[in-house]
C-alpha cells in the first residue's frame, strides 16, 4: 500500500500510515499497523459482510454487487489470500464495509487511499488477467560486396502482448507502464503477427536506429 501511494500520490510511507490510521479511526478500514498480505481463516468466514457493505460505496458498488451475486467469495478461505501461518500480529488491511458516511469528512488524499484499499480488496475475487503474447524472430540476409567477407545473417527479436481479458484489472486499475504502452498492438496488428509461420518472408521498407539504455536489475 505504501508503494502504491508513493507512486500514485507522491506521499511518504509515514503519511500513508497516518492516512490509514485516520481511516481506521473512522471505522472505514481494519487495523493499519500490519505488514501482513493475507487474511485469517476467521476473517475469511465473515468476508461477505465486508463486501456487502461496499455495495453502498458508489464508485465500486457494481463490482461488490457482482461478487455477492456470483458468490465467489465463499471459497476465499481456501485461496492463497488466506493463511493463518503468515500472520504475526494482524491480518491485511481491508475495508470494513462500514462507516461510509464518514467519507464526506475526509480530504482528497484520504478518500483516494480508501479507494485503493477497497479496489485491491475486491480485486481478489476476480479472475487473473489474460494476455495474448507474440514473439518474433526475424532473420535478415547480409550481402557483402565483392572481395569482402562472405555473406551472413543477422537476427532481430520482438515481443508483443495484448490484454485479452482484464480480469481483476477491471477493478484494480489497468497498467500504465510506459514500456507496455510502447508495445501496445491493435487487434488487427496482433492478428497479422500471429498468422506468421516459420520461414515466411516479410518485405522490409526501412531500418531505424534508436538509442536507449538498459535498466539495472533491482537490488531487492
Language-model-derived ranges and their functions:
Residues 2-220:
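Core catalytic DNA strand-manipulation module of type IA topoisomerases
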Amino acid at each position: 500500500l505504501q508503494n502504491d501511494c508513493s507512486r500514485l500520490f507522491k506521499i511518504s510511507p509515514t503519511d500513508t500510515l497516518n492516512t490509514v490510521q485516520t481511516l481506521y479511526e473512522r471505522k472505514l478500514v481494519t487495523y493499519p499497523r500490519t505488514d501482513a498480505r493475507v487474511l485469517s481463516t476467521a476473517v475469511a468466514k465473515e468476508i461477505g459482510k465486508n463486501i456487502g457493505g461496499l455495495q453502498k460505496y458508489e464508485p465500486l458498488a457494481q463490482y461488490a454487487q457482482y461478487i455477492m451475486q456470483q458468490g465467489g467469495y465463499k471459497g476465499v478461505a481456501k485461496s492463497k489470500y488466506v493463511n493463518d501461518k503468515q500472520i504475526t500480529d494482524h491480518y491485511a488491511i481491508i475495508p470494513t464495509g462500514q462507516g461510509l458516511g464518514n467519507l464526506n469528512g475526509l480530504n482528497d488524499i484520504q478518500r483516494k487511499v480508501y479507494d485503493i484499499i477497497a479496489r485491491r480488496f475486491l480485486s481478489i475475487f476476480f479472475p487473473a488477467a489474460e494476455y495474448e503474447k507474440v514473439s518474433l524472430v526475424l532473420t535478415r540476409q547480409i550481402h557483402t560486396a565483392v572481395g569482402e567477407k562472405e555473406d551472413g545473417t543477422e537476427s532481430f527479436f520482438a515481443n508483443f502482448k495484448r490484454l485479452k481479458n482484464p480480469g481483476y484489472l477491471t477493478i484494480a486499475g489497468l497498467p500504465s507502464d510506459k514500456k507496455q504502452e510502447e508495445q501496445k498492438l491493435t487487434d488487427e496488428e496482433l492478428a497479422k503477427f500471429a498468422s506468421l509461420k516459420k520461414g515466411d518472408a516479410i518485405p522490409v521498407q526501412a531500418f531505424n536506429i534508436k538509442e536507449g539504455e538498459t535498466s539495472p536489475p533491482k537490488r531487492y
